[in-house]
């Protein structure tokens, strides 16, 4: 059975302002994932399932100014559609370091991921690399990722492909 998940990484109040350029695409990806889940459920779940997951970064370093646990900055941005309670917290760049998220993956037999979020040069990069290293199929939604440094996006998309990720726009999956 193919179980999939849309993973939205670090779209929080303290993230780069560039998230505003892609929030419409991220919300469209969430709607697509919901429709995909309904389609799979209609098929009697014989083909698998689609989960929608949100990853939040918490910066636990002393003296930090951003992503502080319990602060407004660590909250998911208000413009984003939140359609599930699958919200996991990480303290490192790689989302797989979240024990709760890793347990969720195992419990739901998830083996394929569609990735959106920020930052393309940090947390998205580390998560995609480590997902591929763990043997998962990874699809990066190229129009649903952003960075503090937009000039690095083309380089990052090429990096994801070089590590075995499929890189396409959301429209190419719809």
Report residues per predicted region:
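Active-site acidic carboxylates
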Residues: 1-87, 102-103, 165-166
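A structural signal for isolated positions on well-ordered beta-strands in alpha/beta enzyme cores
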Residues: 5, 51-53, 112-114, 137-139
């Amino acid at each position: 059975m193919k179980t999939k998940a849309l993973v939205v990484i670090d779209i929080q109040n303290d993230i780069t302002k560039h998230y505003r350029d892609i929030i419409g695409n991220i919300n469209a990806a969430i709607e697509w994932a919901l429709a995909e889940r309904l389609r799979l459920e209609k098929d009697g779940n014989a083909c698998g399932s689609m989960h929608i997951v949100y990853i939040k970064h918490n910066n636990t370093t002393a003296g930090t100014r951003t992503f502080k646990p319990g602060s407004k900055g660590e909250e998911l941005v208000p413009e984003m559609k939140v359609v599930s309670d699958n919200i996991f917290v990480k303290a490192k760049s790689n989302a797989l370091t979240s024990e709760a998220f890793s347990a969720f993956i195992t419990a739901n037999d998830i083996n394929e991921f569609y990735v959106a979020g920020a930052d393309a040069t940090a947390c998205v990069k580390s998560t995609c690399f480590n997902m591929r290293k763990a043997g998962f199929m990874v699809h990066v939604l190229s129009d649903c990722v952003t960075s503090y440094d937009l000039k690095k996006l083309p380089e990052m998309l090429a990096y994801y492909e070089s590590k075995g990720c499929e890189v396409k726009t959301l429209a190419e999956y719809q």
